[in-house]
């Protein structure tokens, strides 16, 4: 928003006019803040939905996205609800044995394939032949792991890239 100057004299009417102008400005600022949060939420949800739709059905389970409103109808955030056996792996992966790049974190560290600490000197995450595990019933299964699709990471990156542009569009 551009700089707003409100001038007033010392008369009662002038002070009341300044108060009225401040109330209008407060309403405008609240409306713009709501639009700003809505635009960022919509962008994040769009990226999450696009990422989720790219995931094979057997890996993603089901998901639901929504924009969250308070009792007055103001947008206060967005929500993504996942259900299924492998939902954590959608963001973080598990036992992946094929190459993907690491992703940088704001702290300067990275996460990605093989970055989770293991108690063994060498984990199985980089075995090109995959690995075997035994399920609860004692049945052995072969796996190449679950890829990290990272819908939340990609949504965060899209928001970080667009936040200044959207702020300029909304606040002028």
Specify the residue positions occupied by each region the protein language model found.
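Short amphipathic alpha-helical segments with heptad-repeat character
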Residues: 23, 27-34, 38, 153
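Amphipathic alpha-helical hairpins
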Residues: 24, 28, 53, 57-58
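Generic alpha-helical secondary structure signal
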Residues: 13-16, 20, 35, 153, ...
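Non-globular disordered terminal and juxtamembrane segments underlying protein topogenesis/assembly
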Residues: 33-51, 163
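N-terminal, Lys/Arg- and Ser/Thr-rich interaction peptides
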Residues: 1-28
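Charged, low-complexity interaction tracts
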Residues: 2-7, 57-172
């Amino acid at each position: 928003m551009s700089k707003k100057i409100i001038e007033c004299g010392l008369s009662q009417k002038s002070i009341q006019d300044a108060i009225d102008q401040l109330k209008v400005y407060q309403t405008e600022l609240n409306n713009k803040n709501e639009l700003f949060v809505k635009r960022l939420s919509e962008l994040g949800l769009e990226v999450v939905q696009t990422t989720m739709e790219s995931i094979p059905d057997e890996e993603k389970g089901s998901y639901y996205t929504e924009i969250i409103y308070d009792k007055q109808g103001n947008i206060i955030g967005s929500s993504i609800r996942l259900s299924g056996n492998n939902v954590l792996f959608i963001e973080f992966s598990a036992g992946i044995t094929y190459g993907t790049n690491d992703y940088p974190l704001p702290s300067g560290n990275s996460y990605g394939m093989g970055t989770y600490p293991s108690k063994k000197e060498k984990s199985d995450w980089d075995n090109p032949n995959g690995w075997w595990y035994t399920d609860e019933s004692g049945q052995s299964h072969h796996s190449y792991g679950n890829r990290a699709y990272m819908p939340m990471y990609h949504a965060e990156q899209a928001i970080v890239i667009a936040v200044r542009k959207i702020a300029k569009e909304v606040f002028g």
